[in-house]
Amino acid sequence: PDIVPVFMSGYSDKEYLKAAIKLKAVNYIEKPLNPVEIRDAIMEARDLCLEKKRTRQNASIHSMESASRLALLLTQPFAHAKESIDQLIAELSLSISNTTPFTAIVLKTDTEEELPLSEANAMFLSVREFLKTFHIDCIFAEKRVQYMVYFLFGSTPGAAVRKSIEEFFCNLYSRCTRFCIAAGDTVTGISRAYQSY
């Protein structure tokens, strides 16, 4: 977790100081306690926590953008973008091999307006969370405003799992707009993901 320790000790003990250093404490305050020193240490700890949170959020946004670029690349034949695809897979640390099953799901919405980014991201994250129960991961891209393209990969979904996934997508998108949904055949390997699309 993102914590920033501040040590306050009633003893001038070298072992406490070593422990504080090992735990990367922001400050080590000894008796007699000085309220100004405590306040400054807490403010510094707060600032460090906020910075860690911002860094984590920026990394998450960058990761989602990279995953979206990968999904867009998979909507074209593999040979056209092999190097970029390989680079993005490595950057995202995805466990994809030439035997990984891929299934494309395309939703065509009945809107001319782009979904707000926060809403599209929230929907993607809820899809991803839902799929975890089936040991399936996904990447997502919005294409030409009306098309939501998901590439599911990981375990091969059986008929019951496909039905559950289909129902989940229908429930998720029915709250927003009218839409059509289509799922491609499950194919083996990222080089064939385009064929599912």
Protein language model regions, located:
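A broadly used, surface-exposed interaction patch
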Residues: 2-3, 168
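Conserved phosphoryl-transfer motifs of two-component systems
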Residues: 3-4, 26-28
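Alpha4-beta5-alpha5 switch/output surface of CheY-like receiver
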Residues: 13-16
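Interdomain helical linkers/hinges and coiled-coil/dimerization scaffolds
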Residues: 21, 25-27, 33-164, 183-195
